């Protein structure tokens, strides 16, 4: 009862709890049941009285009163008449809020088709009737009749008749012998008369009988829709509407503007058109107007309803008075401005403010400075409450006055209110979760928010005018979450890679670096100090400087916590820093007794965090920040133009390179090299020159100089200090200031041959300046475009991964991934330790020598284990992965491993999918914003040699080499590798060497680190002979397949293979070179094939017919693409391409089986390759390869499954089909990582794995068994496994399927939740599909729950849901028990009441 009294003034319906939402097609009865009355007039409101017109679009009688508890004519006012219907104006006396809820309807005089089911492809009506969309439209828009009942005539059912044909048929057969209808009535009749069960049975029979793929697809599509209708209980004829619902008037408001005009929602215009046409049609029917006029009116009615539902989907767009298209109901839902994304997924919130940020170096890490004015406004309700409680005011009005006058007691109360009440700070764009963090406010004067310098990295903030928003968490729960989970002190590590993100940068780094410098010959060198006190004394009296080499005792503690001390060689500066280290046995002085570059500082903070915990780390960070600032200020480091040193040898290096380029120019003129080769060599030469000048410059800057008078060391070069410490600037930028700017790129990505020889200190010539504007402009244009692209990528990633949540502790999976170190060009880019840290071991990890267990199976690999693993030199470890996790909804904690942002095993309910998406998307934006910082300077990425990365013994895997006529060893194998073994015979490095490389070592040789192993020409790919003999040409016909091209500038000719398929005469040619012996017999190769070498287009012939060649000699060469600059520009689209699982343009062709290569008959302009399997039970596989693609296999080559037949980027689908899930995972992870690694961005593999897991959720049914699926259906992998288990138990036939890889957009749209899919993309299509199938959304993921306004099932929300579930289950158990024991109804009733109350 007391609830009623409480809610007297604002009665609200109790919120209904629900577990799922269903969408289906509304039947006419349903629409009528929603409606409160029919709308008969198109009028809206009376322009004089501003009162709604009766029976109009805003009618108060239908939709409810305009003012609370007041009828329209004013006869009944106030609460006491609640629920009475006024007899004069017919308005119910109730809240005006019902105008947001009550719907009306329009009775249509003729049925119309619902445009969504008609035009949304595939057209549901069309598929169901098995007619084309064109035909249906002809009927609907009154062009053709359709036969619904042929009777005994020769007409067929569904036959279309034009007006004339219809008349002829009527004359011929008589009007009552058959029925043919026109318009939506016809379609309605056809749909209503469908017997779905019978059609479904017929389709199944047809499916079983048909053999053609196309027909099967068509039948399957139709069967699916028929089954959807059967299962959902929707009727097909409901897709034709006889009644149109009208949405509540407050959702399509009409607002009077000053000056007697009105602003109205577009929907009112659209509804008005429908009502006008409908009323006109009714009148015409009453008047018995001629058929043609009625038909025209019906067609116009259909168009009006179409425009109301989806304007512009069919015909021309209906525009308003200002030529702007009207927003239809579909447009209200669609896109960024639609209902889903604008109002449901993101809302504007109150209790927020924004202001400019300034730095607050005296704040603690958990604090922020909040301007008093802002705090007063934000915390108003709290202040009012406190003023009331303390008796300063008795009403809100008084409190308001006090606050407005800013009385002194208000400020005291504000202090109390703010104490311990965290606020959230957010900087847009919020690219990852660290873009919103909680701080404790401290009140400050002024109008700018103060931000702690150490959190700037996380927010990506700087103080050049950035603004930030402040939000106040109101409820106790929100304050608790802000404090416990979002406080800046809890976000020390980066969620993407687990490294500290609270790291000093810029000035702080410079200060700490300056503090840690050691200088020679400083005063007091070699002195010994007992403790910090003495040292401080000496410093103050200038006996020593910060950089003097000294010995000093450093005090720390041992494992029991007793003080111990040890003497170190160090400097006073480093001792000052050492004093700040937490006293802990695991934190030795050594970690700050070194040059404090940014990397080392980061390592130091990481070390302190791992060993001393969060609290100590936060205090330590604050202290080193203050120390850094203090000493950066004291040191006074700055630089002038003379600090940019131009190396003396610059002129000499430039002159030498210019001489080289002249020489290449000459070689080109003499015809020794091609234009392309010349270009590559010139670019190469200038690249090397730039590097050389840079090296010289850096050497000059690094050099230590001594003052001849005092003998003391001069201060280091300031610019070098800034760059080397990692505070600001890079070698690249210094090179442009003091070396030479180097090569520039054109906007197309090619490199301009003439470099910029000057640097910024000397100044550029006009030509150089012009050349360099190219790259700079491209950078600026790219930035603008790519920010959007990167944001879109993040959005797709979040959408596909949003429901990957940690939902259980251990799924018990017995499969996983194999981790190996990543080696790139012989360098280890990611060690095995880095890759397995924080992952769960799948099998026990054993020491390779002693065999002892380092990590047991199922335990997480920690830092200490990694050290042992790296020392033991283990090369391959099996770990658990999210990709192979067997949890039904979400991922299990064991498969995921460590929560990188906390450094502990991941908690249940953590939204790992969203974290993964943010970790991958955030650097994308960063990188795209940073392209132009290089000023468009080109970096050539091409290697042409291989150096040993370790000492050891050489072993050649798949050895296949010959000595050529120059006496060099040449690699003849396609898949040969050079292995370097250490003393114990373990592989330390594996280098792939390409076909045609020159080898400098052979099996069993020992190599030193850095020794050259092999080299090759990166710009051409050679074709070499394996046997000695005489060359003969086959099918190399002048003018057809070979042309002598003379270079315009030199007149030298070279013979090049041209595209022989372009002429009809050349279509059967197979240009090749054969090697014969003296007798003219074709020689055999080692593998048994003939020594015939097929040539592809653009090959340059290197020998003449009849020439004598030795094994390993080059007989032709194929030029490669010239060097393009690598830049994340290639990177971001590449990442998107991989995640979208698109087939690359010229994708590689991969062998599906092991076998021998044979050449088959060529087909048009394709070359046919057949692989004959080694195993006779398998069929041979054929591939068609476009002629003229560089192709390196020869007849008779042995090929293994998974090897490339044609080079290029492989299509991920092929890898999945041929090599399986694990190979696909490692390919995608490595490719994506490579893009980010190039930019120096660290992302943990597990994030990419989580996304790939979401892409691999579905299987395509191949054998349906008794599952009830149709072959070709995409089904959830785990769902299929569950169904199969059930079928096997029942003794039925299980189904089977192959895993399919879906791109992230496709995977997002295929989620089981239609709400989530609709809010992502293609809203109309998703909703149409869901409505036909009567889909149920069980609200499992995050987005669905945000949209319906519930706590998300992750984090604290996940726990709340879990507790609720447990409670409900427990209640049900108790009720059941009671029912069994006491049969008395009263006891039951009482108990039910009790549980209901408890639930409420």
Swiss-Prot record:
Cofactor: Mg(2+); Zn(2+)
Manner of cofactor binding, per the entry note: Binds 1 Mg(2+) ion per subunit.
UniProt keyword annotations, A-Z: DNA-directed RNA polymerase, Magnesium, Metal-binding, Nucleotidyltransferase, Transcription, Transferase, Zinc
Cellular component terms (Gene Ontology): DNA-directed RNA polymerase complex
Residues involved in Mg(2+) binding: 462, 464, 466
GO terms classed as biological process: DNA-templated transcription
SMART domains the record matches: RPOLA_N
Catalysed reactions listed for this entry: RNA(n) + a ribonucleoside 5'-triphosphate = RNA(n+1) + diphosphate
EC number: 2.7.7.6
Positions with a binding annotation for Zn(2+) 1: 71, 73, 86, 89
Domain of life, per lineage: Bacteria
Gene Ontology molecular functions: DNA binding; DNA-directed RNA polymerase activity; magnesium ion binding; zinc ion binding
CDD domains noted in UniProt: RNAP_beta'_C, RNAP_beta'_N
EC class of the enzyme, as a word: transferase
InterPro entries (UniProt xref): DNA-dir_RpoC_beta_prime (IPR045867), DNA-dir_RpoC_beta_prime_bact (IPR012754), RNA_pol_asu (IPR000722), RNA_pol_N (IPR006592), RNA_pol_Rpb1_1 (IPR007080), RNA_pol_Rpb1_3 (IPR007066), RNA_pol_Rpb1_3_sf (IPR042102), RNA_pol_Rpb1_4 (IPR007083)
Annotated Zn(2+) 2 binding sites: 811, 885, 892, 895
Stated family: Belongs to the RNA polymerase beta' chain family.
Stored NCBIfam families: rpoC_TIGR (TIGR02386)
Protein role: DNA-dependent RNA polymerase catalyzes the transcription of DNA into RNA using the four ribonucleoside triphosphates as substrates.
Assembly notes: The RNAP catalytic core consists of 2 alpha, 1 beta, 1 beta' and 1 omega subunit. When a sigma factor is associated with the core the holoenzyme is formed, which can initiate transcription.
PANTHER family, A to Z: DNA-DIRECTED RNA POLYMERASE, DNA-DIRECTED RNA POLYMERASE SUBUNIT BETA
Name the UniProt record assigns to this protein: DNA-directed RNA polymerase subunit beta'
Gene expressing this chain: rpoC
């Amino acid at each position: 009862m007391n609830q009623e009294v409480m809610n007297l003034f604002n009665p609200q319906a109790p919120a209904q709890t629900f577990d799922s939402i269903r969408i289906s097609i509304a039947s006419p009865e349903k629409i009528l049941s929603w409606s409160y009355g029919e709308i008969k007039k198109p009028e809206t409101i009376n322009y004089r009285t501003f009162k709604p017109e009766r029976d109009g679009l805003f009618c108060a009688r239908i939709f409810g009163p305009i003012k609370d508890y007041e009828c329209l004519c004013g006869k009944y006012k106030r609460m006491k008449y609640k629920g009475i219907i006024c007899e004069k104006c017919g308005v119910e006396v109730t809240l005006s809020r019902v105008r947001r809820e009550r719907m009306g309807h329009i009775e249509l005089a003729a049925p119309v088709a619902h445009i969504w089911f008609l035009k949304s492809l595939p057209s549901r009506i069309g598929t169901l009737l098995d007619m084309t969309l064109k035909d249906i439209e002809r009927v609907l828009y009154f062009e053709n009749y359709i036969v619904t009942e042929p009777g005994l005539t020769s007409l067929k059912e569904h036959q279309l008749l034009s007006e004339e044909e219809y008349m002829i048929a009527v004359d011929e057969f008589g009007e009552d012998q058959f029925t043919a209808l026109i318009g939506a009535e016809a379609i309605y009749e056809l749909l209503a008369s469908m017997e779905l069960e019978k059609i479904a049975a017929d389709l199944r029979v047809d499916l079983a009988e048909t053999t053609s793929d196309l027909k099967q697809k068509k039948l399957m599509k139709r069967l699916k829709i028929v089954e959807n209708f059967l299962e959902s209980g929707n009727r097909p004829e409901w897709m034709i509407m006889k009644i149109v619902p009208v949405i509540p008037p407050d959702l399509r408001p009409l607002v009077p503007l000053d000056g007697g005009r009105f602003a109205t929602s577009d929907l009112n215009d659209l509804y008005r058109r429908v009502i006008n046409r409908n009323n006109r049609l009714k009148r015409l029917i009453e008047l018995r107007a001629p058929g043609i006029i009625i038909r025209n009116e019906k067609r116009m009615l259909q168009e009006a309803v179409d425009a109301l539902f989806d304007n512009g989907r069919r015909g021309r767009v209906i525009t308003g008075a200002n030529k702007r298209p009207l927003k239809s109901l579909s447009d209200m839902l669609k896109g960024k401005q639609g209902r889903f994304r604008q109002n449901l997924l993101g809302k504007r919130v109150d209790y927020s403010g924004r202001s400019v940020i300034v730095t607050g170096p005296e704040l603690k890490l958990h604090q922020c400075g909040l301007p008093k004015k802002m705090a007063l406004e934000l915390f108003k309700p709290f202040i009012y409450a406190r003023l009331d409680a303390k008796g300063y005011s008795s009403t809100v009005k008084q409190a308001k006055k006090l606050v407005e006058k800013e009385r002194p007691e208000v400020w005291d109360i504000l202090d109390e209110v703010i104490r311990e009440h965290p606020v959230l700070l957010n900087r847009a764009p919020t690219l990852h979760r660290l873009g919103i963090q909680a701080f404790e406010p401290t009140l400050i004067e002024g109008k700018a928010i103060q931000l702690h310098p150490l959190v700037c990295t996380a927010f990506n903030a700087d103080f050049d005018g950035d603004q930030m928003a402040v939000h106040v968490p109101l409820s106790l729960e929100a304050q608790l979450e802000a404090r416990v989970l979002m406080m800046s002190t809890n976000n020390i590590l980066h969620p993407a890679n687990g490294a500290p993100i609270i790291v000093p940068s810029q000035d702080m780094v410079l200060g700490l670096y300056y503090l840690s410098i050691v200088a020679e010959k400083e005063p007091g060198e070699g002195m010994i100090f007992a403790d910090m006190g003495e040292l401080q004394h000496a410093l103050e009296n200038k006996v020593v400087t910060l950089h003097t080499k000294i010995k000093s005792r450093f005090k720390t503690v041992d494992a029991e916590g007793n003080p111990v001390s040890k003497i170190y060689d160090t400097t006073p500066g480093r001792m000052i820093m050492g004093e700040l280290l937490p006293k802990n046995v695991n934190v030795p002085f050594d970690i700050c007794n070194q040059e404090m570059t940014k990397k080392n500082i980061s390592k130091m903070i990481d070390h302190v965090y791992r060993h001393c915990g969060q609290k100590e780390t936060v205090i330590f960070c604050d202290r080193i920040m203050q120390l850094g600032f203090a000493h950066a200020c004291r040191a006074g480091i700055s630089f002038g133009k003379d600090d940019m040193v131009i190396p003396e040898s610059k002129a000499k290096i430039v002159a030498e390179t210019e001489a080289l380029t002249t020489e290449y120019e000459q070689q080109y003129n003499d015809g020794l090299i091609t234009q392309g080769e010349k270009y590559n060599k010139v670019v190469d030469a200038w690249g090397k020159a730039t590097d050389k000048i840079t090296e010289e410059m850096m050497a000059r800057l690094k050099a230590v100089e001594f003052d001849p008078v005092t003998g003391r060391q001069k201060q280091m070069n300031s610019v070098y200090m800034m760059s080397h410490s990692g505070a600001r600037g890079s070698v690249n930028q210094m090179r442009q200031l003091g070396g030479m700017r180097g090569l520039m790129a054109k906007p197309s990505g090619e490199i301009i041959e003439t470099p910029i020889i000057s640097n910024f200190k000397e100044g550029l010539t006009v030509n150089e300046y012009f050349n360099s504007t190219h790259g700079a402009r491209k950078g600026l244009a790219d930035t603008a475009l790519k920010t959007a692209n990167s944001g879109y990528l993040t959005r797709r990633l979040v959408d596909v991964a949003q429901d990957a949540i940690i939902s259980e502790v251990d799924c018990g999976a017995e499969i996983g991934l194999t981790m190996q170190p990543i080696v790139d060009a012989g360098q280890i880019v990611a060690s095995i330790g880095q890759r397995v840290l924080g992952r769960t071991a799948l099998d026990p990890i054993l020491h390779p020598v002693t065999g002892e267990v380092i990590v047991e199976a199922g335990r997480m690999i920690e830092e200490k284990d990694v050290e042992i693993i790296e020392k033991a030199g283990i090369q391959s470890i099996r770990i658990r992965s999210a990709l192979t996790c067997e949890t039904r909804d979400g991922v299990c904690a064991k498969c995921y491993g460590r929560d990188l942002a906390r450094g502990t095993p991941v908690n249940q309910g953590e939204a790992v999918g969203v974290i993964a998406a943010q970790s991958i998307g955030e650097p994308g934006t960063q990188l795209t914003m940073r392209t132009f910082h290089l000023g468009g300077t080109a970096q050539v990425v091409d290697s042409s040699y291989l150096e040993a990365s370790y000492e050891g013994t050489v072993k050649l895997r798949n050895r296949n080499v010959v000595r050529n006529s120059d006496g060099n060893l040449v690699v003849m194998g396609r898949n040969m590798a050079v292995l370097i073994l250490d003393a114990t015979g373990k592989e330390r490095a594996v280098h792939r060497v390409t076909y045609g490389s020159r080898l400098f070592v052979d099996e069993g040789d020992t190599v030193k680190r850095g020794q050259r192993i092999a080299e090759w020409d990166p710009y051409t790919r050679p074709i070499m002979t394996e046997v000695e003999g005489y060359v003969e040409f086959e099918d190399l016909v002048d003018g057809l397949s070979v042309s002598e091209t003379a270079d315009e500038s030199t007149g030298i000719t070279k013979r090049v293979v041209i595209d022989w398929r372009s002429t009809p005469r050349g279509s059967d040619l197979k240009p090749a070179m054969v090697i014969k012996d003296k007798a003219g017999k074709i020689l055999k190769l080692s593998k048994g094939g003939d020594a015939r070498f097929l040539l592809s287009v653009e090959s340059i012939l290197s020998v003449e017919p009849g020439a004598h060649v030795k094994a390993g000699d080059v007989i032709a060469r194929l030029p490669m693409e010239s060097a393009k600059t690598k830049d994340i520009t290639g990177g971001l689209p590449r990442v998107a391409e991989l995640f979208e699982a698109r087939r690359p343009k010229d994708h590689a062709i991969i062998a599906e089986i092991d076998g021998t290569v044979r050449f088959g008959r060529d087909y048009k302009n394709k070359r046919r390759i057949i692989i004959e399997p080694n195993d006779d039970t398998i069929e041979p596989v054929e591939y068609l390869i476009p002629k003229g693609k560089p192709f390196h296999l020869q007849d008779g080559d042995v090929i293994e499954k998974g090897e490339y037949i044609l080079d290029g980027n492989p299509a991920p689908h092929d890898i999945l089909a041929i090599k399986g899930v694990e190979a696909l995972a490692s390919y995608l992870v490595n490719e994506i990582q490579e893009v980010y690694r190039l930019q120096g961005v660290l992302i943990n593999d597990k994030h990419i794995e989580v996304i790939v897991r979401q892409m691999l959720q579905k299987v395509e049914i191949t054998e349906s068994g008794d599952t009830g699926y149709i072959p070709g259906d995409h089904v959830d992998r785990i769902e299929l496994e569950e169904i199969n288990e059930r079928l096997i138990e029942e003794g039925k036939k299980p189904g089977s399927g192959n895993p399919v890889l879906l791109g992230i957009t496709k995977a997002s749209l295929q989620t089981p939740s239609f709400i989530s899919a609709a809010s992502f993309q293609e809203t109309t299509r998703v909703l149409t599909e869901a409505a036909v199938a009567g889909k149920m959304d069980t609200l499992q993921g995050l987005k669905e729950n945000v949209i319906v306004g519930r706590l998300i099932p992750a984090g604290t929300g996940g726990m709340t849901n879990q507790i609720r579930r447990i409670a409900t289950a427990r209640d049900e158990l108790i009720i059941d028990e009671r029912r069994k024991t006491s049969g008395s109804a009263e006891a039951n009733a009482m108990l039910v009441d009790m549980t209901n109350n408890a639930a409420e």
